[in-house]
């Protein structure tokens, strides 16, 4: 299976593990984001290293110890080994690594941490004792982000002992598209709008089928491969799913302000909704976003679902659960998904893709001057008694740059460009650059203050 993307993360892990001294690595991120495959890929390039890769279980210490002992014996070419406990096994590996390179990977570390009392302290004691005389590298990996983050906090026994802490995020649109290169740029936008940047989801996409057929077979038809992916993930993380479903339902329909979400979701109280939103934010499924020109104004802040599959699921599958069970899968898609997906959902997601494009260009030094902030811009227009927000605006040392994203079947014309700029300037926002993203190209000419970006550029 070809390994795709993650070049920067892979390079950082390899550099750390190839160091001559004892090293400890922490890798964490949401489920399905590709942590295990990333670690395995990094290990393939390590020569003369004995590797013990153990996927921890939600069982007892004794059960984990027995399984891990077998792997240790195999990796070191020893006869069957027996240890009194995990502490003794860890100490054994540190001693063995005094004259050889050994890497121990504990995948889903929180499971073993639950089973072994004081495991963080056990590791701390052995690391401190052998930091200078052992070449045992330890990689701790886990999907429970809050637990994994706590390992590098000041109160943790492992504080100051982790040489590389890497939070693995979903891929952006550009890297995600490498999983389905045969599709057109338009199709790639639609696929990312559903499957996002999770490698596990993207590997399931069949390039011999249409976007529509992939969505039906993987998400919307009863029994689809990813039918229960969103609810099962949330059920494992959230205790009160009724409230979560209500909040998701409101967010998926486009409500983002606190008061609007509370009213539309029918959650019993503000504190109850705050608990749900805080949890969803910690899971990085929802983000709280404030205007870049008024970042402390709570009234102008909004909540947005940033995980595409969760957004798609709650907008179409969860909302239409009864009809989905009654209709043929293709009829269901055509009746309850197709039109809104093309006219509203994908154009909305295209704005996020455009933001990702700008961030990618900015990080690689292709935007001058580089911007320090990107987000929505809130405006008040007293003359016309209106207020609102522009969706994609960046801020740099020279001021603001405005970007408009159009995912439509006709080109952006010069008239549209002029009208958009006039509308922006009428609000009092002065920009040194106006950028336009277009699905279907342009029938307009660039000037010294405009920049045009089409899909081939974005995926090139």
Give the ranges of each region predicted by the language model.
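A cross-kingdom feature that marks ATP-driven nucleic-acid transaction machinery
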Residues: 301-460
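Phosphate-binding site recognition
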Residues: 1-335
């Amino acid at each position: 299976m070809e390994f795709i993307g993650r070049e920067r993360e892979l390079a950082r892990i390899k550099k750390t593990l190839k160091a001559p001294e004892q090293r400890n690595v922490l890798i964490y991120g949401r489920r399905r984001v590709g942590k295990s495959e990333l670690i395995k890929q990094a290990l393939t390039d390590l020569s003369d290293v004995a590797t013990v890769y153990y996927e921890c279980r939600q069982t007892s210490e004794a059960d984990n110890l027995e399984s891990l002992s077998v792997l240790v014996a195999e990796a070191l070419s020893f006869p069957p080994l027996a240890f009194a406990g995990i502490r003794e096994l860890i100490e054994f590996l540190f001693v063995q690594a005094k004259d050889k390179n050994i890497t121990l990977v504990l995948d889903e570390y929180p499971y073993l941490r639950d089973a072994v009392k004081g495991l963080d302290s056990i590791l701390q004691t052995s690391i401190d004792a052998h930091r200078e005389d052992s070449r045992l590298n330890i990689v701790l990996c886990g999907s429970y982000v809050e637990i994994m983050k706590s390992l590098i906090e000041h109160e943790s026994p492992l504080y100051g002992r982790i040489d590389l802490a890497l939070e693995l995020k979903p891929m952006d649109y550009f890297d995600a598209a490498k999983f389905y290169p045969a599709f057109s740029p338009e199709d790639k936008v639609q696929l990312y709008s559903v499957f996002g940047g999770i490698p596990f989801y993207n590997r399931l996409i069949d390039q011999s089928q249409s976007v529509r057929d992939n969505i039906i077979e993987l998400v919307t038809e009863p029994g689809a491969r990813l039918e229960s992916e969103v609810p099962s993930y949330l059920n494992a993380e959230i205790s009160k799913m009724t409230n979560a479903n209500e909040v998701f339902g409101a967010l998926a329909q486009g409500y983002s302000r606190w008061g609007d979400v509370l009213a539309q979701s029918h959650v019993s109280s503000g504190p109850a909704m705050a608990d749900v939103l805080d949890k969803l934010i910690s899971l990085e499924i929802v983000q709280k976003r404030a205007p870049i020109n008024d970042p402390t104004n709570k009234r102008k802040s909004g909540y947005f679902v940033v995980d595409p599959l969760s957004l798609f699921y709650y907008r179409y599958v969860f909302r239409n659960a009864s009809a989905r069970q009654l209709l043929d899968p293709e009829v269901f898609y055509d009746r309850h998904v197709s039109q809104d997906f093309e006219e509203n959902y994908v154009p909305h997601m295209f704005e996020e893709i455009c933001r990702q494009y700008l961030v990618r260009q900015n990080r690689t030094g292709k935007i001058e001057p580089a911007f320090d902030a990107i987000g929505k811009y809130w405006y008040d227009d007293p003359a016309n008694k209106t207020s609102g927000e522009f969706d994609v605006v960046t801020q740099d040392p020279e001021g603001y740059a405005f970007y408009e994203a159009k995912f439509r079947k006709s080109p952006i014309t010069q008239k549209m460009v002029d009208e958009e700029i006039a509308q922006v300037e009428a609000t009092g926002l002065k920009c040194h650059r106006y950028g336009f993203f277009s699905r279907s190209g342009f029938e307009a000419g660039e000037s010294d203050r405009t920049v045009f970006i089409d899909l081939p550029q974005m995926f090139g």
